[in-house]
Amino acid sequence: MPSLKDLKNRIASVKATQKITKAMKMVAAAKLRRAQEAAEAARPYSQRMGAVLANIAKAVTDADGAPTLMTGTGKDQVHLLVVCTAERGLCGGFNSQIARFARDHVRKLVAEGKTVKIFTVGKKGYDILRREYASLIIERKELRDVKRIGFENADQIGKRIIDMYAAGEFDVCTLFYSEFKSVISQIPTAQQLIPASTGAVQAEDAAHAGAVYEYEPDPASILEDLIPRNISVQIFRALLENVAGEMGAKMSAMDNATRNAGEMINKLTLSYNRQRQAQITKELIEIISGAEAL
């Protein structure tokens, strides 16, 4: 059984930890609001750019000289997975959730006989994935020293991916990140970057439903410039979603830690009081017994 001094020290230690977790929760809450606003502001732009890209792609055929970033290499053998996670921990299962999602994708591709390469963005993703797939990680990018994610950070990553594609290092590139839904809900998401996804175009307003678009100088030239920028925009959105998700997960984790610390303090205080009461009772019995002996 721990002594009164040990219990007192443990109570003081847990109280100090509780102060830290409470402060971290408040900091995460303050950062969450800004991060959430940034992520929500980026969504319409990235979604609309995808729709514009799909519209232009409909007007281009291979014979028109469509960019290889849209048409692909014609093969589906080498896959590059760009896995975006946080730079720091203490955010519950946020990082492990994304890494697990990417790991499942790796296993599926390997089972199909594909060659997999991994590009990690964020220290935690690298730390998790290197335990099992160190030989597959060919590139890593850390943003630990970046105070606020900017488009230039995403653009650097996008240009590096395009350079790797131009060098023939992969055929398909897929982006993995966590889409922010709420403080307690972040959804692991996979988005194909290369070849550029030109899926269904978003529904247009009735006034524009039958619109005919003309492109200058020509659709292929526009795509040549637009697709690289779209890749950077989608990466930028993913990074912003990740920051919002990380702050939400961190706030939730620190709130749980603060409440758990409070419960532990109550239990330790109860043990301290019981032991102190037992010690006082014992001393009183000894005093009374000594008085009776006299």
Curated annotation (Swiss-Prot):
It is found in: Cell inner membrane. Keywords: ATP synthesis, Cell inner membrane, Cell membrane, CF(1), Hydrogen ion transport, Ion transport, Membrane, Transport. It holds the Pfam family ATP-synt. GO terms for biological process: proton motive force-driven plasma membrane ATP synthesis. GO terms for molecular function: ATP binding; proton-transporting ATP synthase activity, rotational mechanism. GO terms for cellular component: plasma membrane; proton-transporting ATP synthase complex. It comes from the Bacteria. It is a peripheral membrane protein. Belongs to the ATPase gamma chain family. HAMAP family: ATP_synth_gamma_bact (MF_00815). PANTHER family: ATP SYNTHASE GAMMA CHAIN (PTHR11693), ATP SYNTHASE SUBUNIT GAMMA, MITOCHONDRIAL (PTHR11693:SF22). F-type ATPases have 2 components, CF(1) - the catalytic core - and CF(0) - the membrane proton channel. CF(1) has five subunits: alpha(3), beta(3), gamma(1), delta(1), epsilon(1). CF(0) has three main subunits: a, b and c. Produces ATP from ADP in the presence of a proton gradient across the membrane. The gamma chain is believed to be important in regulating ATPase activity and the flow of protons through the CF(0) complex. This is ATP synthase gamma chain. The lineage of its organism: Bacteria, Pseudomonadati, Pseudomonadota, Alphaproteobacteria, Hyphomicrobiales.
